Amino acid sequence: MISFSRLRIGAKPSLVVACILLGLAACPALAGMAIEEVETSSGIKAWLVQDYSLPIVTTRFAFRGGRTQDPSGKEGIVNLITELLDEGAGNLDSDAFQERLDDAGAEMLFEAGPDAVYGNMRVLAERKDEAFQLLRLAIEQPRFDQQPVDRLRAQIVSSILARAKDPETAAQFAWMRAIYGDHPYSRREEGTVQTLAAVTTSDLKAVHERIFARGNLTIAVVGAIDPGTLKRDLDRIFGGLPAGPSLTPVVDAVPKLGRAIRVAYDLPQAQLSLAYPGIPRKDPQFFAANLMNQILGGGAFTSRLWNEVREKRGLAYGIYSTLENIDHASALVIGTGTRPDRAAETLSLIQAEVRRMSEEGVSEDELTAAKKKLIGGYAIENLNSSSAVAQTLVQIQLEDRGIEYVERRKQLIQAVTVEDVRAVAKRLLSADPTVMTVGPSLKGTNR
């Protein structure tokens, strides 16, 4: 659901890129990483992992209040803002800003998530001062000049029009509307042609001012920088922002279940999606639910759904289940694609496996294997580079899990019992799901 902004790599970042590529081989050093919290004199906090294996500093940060802060009738504005932050700031117009960024050999990107605006910078340690100055300007003093506004808006509109007849795009929007109704989560990420046309420069400035504030900020830094230097740099980058944000409150969204959605398209496959209740991140049964999901459909090539649908019957090339969590909603989603004439059979088989999980739970052997996967896979998926570490540490802070979470997570997973999994499976999977079928033949897919 996250749309990434353009990643600018200019004329001089070849050394940065080379170091980053080399850094992938150096990642095992991060396995025993020490995370420390630093706080500046102005109260700006960040989590820091010092790593001098390469002369690079990676900074990841987030401002709470993403696309859910789009004003009604001007959906897409937060995404547009992230596209424009490196298109001129302070006394630098778009061309001048990009030239300075190229000269610094830095990588800068911004992205709009549903609940936060994210930023990222990677730069050689020796060039960080000039790069951080540009980052400060981008987040504090974006210009929103008319020419880049018109250009970027036109590019987004062109993308919207190009995807207007794409069945996957139509199906995704139908799915989000069915699950979330009128909640902001159901909105199109980039807005629409009409809502983007309504956005003015004044609107861009107003929404930017509401979101970009020190009290709304989460930061993680990984690389060749010491705490004292980082404190100074954080104040330089973020110290000029207003103290507090002015966010529009967002209510929790309860996914709408028990619905049947049919989207007719002339496709070679029928796409099946099922939504069951999810579980909040802070729920005591969260890790039991994750282990249950791993066994049901989260483990590639090893899950029950994979075994029954793919291995035994060859009904699909792939099938998955996932626990989706955003700040104000959660759901367990199952998805696969199959031949249209086998869609009803596939759907029936999926629901039978879900019922079996709900009624019988899992075995000790299944649970042991799932624990090994969740514990062992975490470092591979989330701590495999300095950028991944920074991203993970920002997310942990946004979820308010505490600085010891990376280690504590192992203990929480190990503590889950077969009885815990059985209880959460019954809780989540006894519900009547929402089912969406996309394809040329929709006969026989009623639940």
From Swiss-Prot:
Transcription regulation in keyword set: no
* InterPro entries (alphabetical): Metalloenz_LuxS/M16, MPP/UQCRC_Complex, Peptidase_M16_C
Q: Which organism is it from?
A: Sinorhizobium fredii (strain NBRC 101917 / NGR234)
State the SUPFAM superfamilies in the record.
LuxS/MPP-like metallohydrolase
Q: What is the lineage of its organism?
A: Bacteria, Pseudomonadati, Pseudomonadota, Alphaproteobacteria, Hyphomicrobiales
Q: Sorted alphabetically, which Gene3D superfamilies does this protein's record hold?
A: Metalloenzyme, LuxS/M16 peptidase-like (3.30.830.10)
Domain of life, per the record? Bacteria
Member of which family? Belongs to the peptidase M16 family.
Q: Quote the protein name from its UniProt record.
A: Uncharacterized zinc protease-like protein y4wB
**Gene Ontology terms, MF aspect:** metal ion binding
PROSITE patterns the UniProt entry points to: PROKAR_LIPOPROTEIN (PS51257)
* UniProt keyword terms in alphabetical order: Plasmid
Entries under Pfam families matching the protein: Peptidase_M16_C
